[in-house]
A protein has these predicted regions:
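Surface-exposed loop/turn motifs in large extracellular/passenger domains
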Residues: 1-25, 33-56, 63-91, 97-129, ...
Length: 546
């Protein structure tokens, strides 16, 4: 239904009633409803009222523009009556609702007070490379997607469920410059369920070069994916990503990728700003690598900025179980072996609970992170636990707040307010036919860390409890075996306490019968077999118990 191949005139389709089933066959290249293949004219589609629509296509969009089209596309689905709207819209290569494969015209999709589903039957992901709602595979265009007061169920594959399509794969990566085009997604007061594969569920497709901006205000969001991010960028995406969530009820989970943030092996800069509402985010892992709950994916290289403020309640869990000897991602922070820098700001009346994946920090860096990490806590109630597992395969432990195990670059922790409870992780590494017990600090470094750590505690902060992992992590300071190299600068820890109250700082202490020794760390200072530690306590510092 709509325009023909190579058409240059505008195509206008208005559906306000009846039951419509429209699809095109393989190789046709035209939309099920909308523009024809290689058309240059504008495409305008309106679906409203008593319309019940199902559409499909191959190459083009199911509802939208044709393959390789260049005209602007505007789709408006609004004010549908109960049990009406879009029942299904699925395309191979093109978007379900949006633009066709290789399309170059700008795409506008508006869904308001409507019911929309891209698949008739539930599925976690598909094998399509176009977005469920957004742009098709290899699209070179800007896109604007607005969802208001609607119920939407969208499924993606290598293309996002809601956002941009894929632009390639490991064998044929995209050659375009990052951020040339931009996808903007606005979701307001809606009930949205989105799932995908290597792409983001809400955000960019795998190997996408598009810049992506995501605004979620109010409503309920359930997003899940495989190796991209549930909300953010896709696997190996290169574009810049901004994620802004306000007053929403959000659940974001991933099998290997990030809950909220950048996808695995992505390289674009990522900004995450979350205020108000309730957010649950879980990163994934496969035993080799884990990604952050909120932050960056494993092996990512882009800079990540995270701000949590204004009363948001957050529960974030990093991925990675170390079952194959790999590392984990932070609850909030970076993924396993991420190379990009990370800064984290928590302020206001926030409530944060964060747990690192095995070997990763609760709040801070993932295992083997090679980027610098800056953590600023200015308010809120914070509970953080470092990751670790006593399964014989876990190579390190993460700090509650600070660095993950094996971190290579500097970590700076500035605590100026809030109430903090932090616990270091505990691990057992038996991979080399001998047992090695490891622990991270409550606040400070993980185990086996060679990057420097600086801890600054001031202002009206209250450390309710800082507990090192039981095998020799410091309460505040270093994890076990951190900085235990001939180079005194590697893994060095500096602790500056100038104000605030430390109610309890406890080093880990455990007797291990098989090794016939105690594993102990300081309350404030060095962990077991750790390197250089400098402690400065002055001014109005108040230490109750250490």
């Amino acid at each position: 239904i709509g325009g023909g191949k190579n058409s240059s005139g505008a195509t206008n389709v208005n559906i306000s009633g009846g039951e419509v089933n429209a699809s095109t066959g393989y190789g046709n290249g035209g939309a099920g409803i909308g523009g024809g293949k290689e058309s240059s004219g504008a495409t305008n589609i309106e679906i409203t009222g008593d319309a019940l629509v199902s559409a499909g296509s191959s190459g083009s969009a199911a509802i939208g523009s044709g393959e390789s089209s260049t005209g602007e596309t505007t789709i408006n689905i609004h004010d549908t009556n109960p049990e009406k709207g879009v029942k299904s819209a699925f395309a191979y290569g093109g978007a379900g609702i949006g633009s066709g494969r290789y399309a170059k015209g700008k795409t506008y999709v508006t869904i308001s007070n409507a019911s929309v589903s891209t698949l008739e039957t539930p599925a976690a992901s598909t094998n399509t490379s176009g977005a469920g709602i957004g742009t098709g595979y290899g699209s070179q265009s800007n896109a604007d997607i607005t969802i208001t007061e609607s119920t939407v169920k969208a499924v993606g594959g290598t293309g996002a469920a809601i956002g941009s399509g894929s632009e390639g794969d490991v064998f044929s990566p995209p050659t375009g410059d990052p951020n040339t085009f931009k996808t903007i997604i606005r979701i307001t007061d809606s009930n949205v369920t989105a799932s995908s594969g290597p792409s983001a569920a809400i955000g960019s497709g795998s190997y996408s070069t598009n810049a992506t901006e995501i605004h979620i205000n109010g409503g309920k969001i359930e997003a899940s994916n495989y190796s991209g991010s549930a909300i953010g960028s896709g696997d190996s995406a290169k574009g810049k990503t901004g994620i802004y969530i306000t007053g929403s009820n959000v659940t974001a989970t991933a099998d290997i990728g990030t809950g909220i943030g950048s996808g695995t092996s992505s390289s674009g800069e990522t900004t995450i700003d979350i205020s108000g509402g309730t957010v649950t985010a879980m990163g994934g892992g496969d035993g080799y690598d884990g990604s952050a709950g909120i932050g960056s994916g494993s092996h990512s290289t882009g800079y990540t900025h995270i701000t949590l403020h204004d009363g948001v309640t957050v529960k974030a869990t990093g991925g990675g179980d170390s079952s194959h000897g790999g590392g984990g991602g932070a609850g909030i922070g970076s993924g396993d072996r991420a190379k990009g820098n990370t800064d984290i700001l928590i302020k206001g009346a926030t409530k944060v609970t964060a747990k690192g994946g095995s070997t990763a920090a609760g709040i801070g860096s993932g295992n083997g992170s090679n980027g610098s990490t800056i953590i600023n806590i200015e308010g809120g109630t914070i509970t953080a636990e470092g990751g670790g597992k006593e399964n014989g395969f876990c190579q390190a432990s993460g700090a509650g707040i600070g660095s993950g195990g094996n971190a290579l670059n500097k970590t700076t922790i500035n605590i100026k307010g809030g109430e903090i409870t932090a616990t270091g992780g505990v691990s057992l590494d038996s991979r080399n036919h001998s047992d090695k017990w490891l622990s991270g600090a409550g606040i400070g470094s993980g185990s086996n860390v060679s990057g420097e750590t600086e801890i600054n505690i001031s202002g009206d902060s209250t450390i309710k409890s800082a507990s090192g992992g039981k095998y020799g992590g410091a309460g505040i300071g270093s994890g076990s075996y951190s900085g235990s190299t001939p180079d005194s600068k590697k893994g060095a820890v500096t602790i500056n306490i100038t104000d605030g109250t430390i109610e309890k700082a406890t080093g880990g202490g455990e007797y291990v019968p098989s090794s016939k020794r105690w594993y102990s760390g300081a309350g404030i200072g060095a962990g077991l077999n750790a390197g250089t530690t400098t402690i400065n306590i002055k001014d109005n510092a108040h230490i109750v118990s250490a």
